[in-house]
């Protein structure tokens, strides 16, 4: 995935954008919360492992990239643009989901074998981290959406989508959810879950192998969006 996205930045002549974005406070805020799983909070190695695994599974694998996945997939689905990028995002999206499911399975196995590790203090710490994660992700969404208001693509809808992913992640490991979710807004995002979890059928008449265009090819902004 890394090579594909690096290639995409090269095609768009945006090689420096990653380093530039890291200078933004809200981007650095995301980096900081995603690195919390490396911080030591518990003297018990078993509990520290569980804490780190839970943060990594829930937030790195199952939340942090999904607002971006949603936006790219939305443009491909409803505007018929960014098709090559959309295909790469789908590969990444599906693999991140698998990674998260594996992590959740491991966490639940630990719960079965060592239930004493799952005390009230751990749950409240994880739920608190979930709220901090959402605050960081919400700032990313506002920056990324930048005032767009389309059916299924506006800041409020994408934020509800993220809240729901966080709630679902917590519930899958036996913790209480932290957010009230607007089901009416969430309804507009169900296509994403259907694509992610359902069995997709290939349209052999229109689906074809694609490659990123060479950097030498010129692009018009209207062609991309």
Regions found by a protein language model. Give the residues of each.
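Non-heme di-metal
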Residues: 1-225
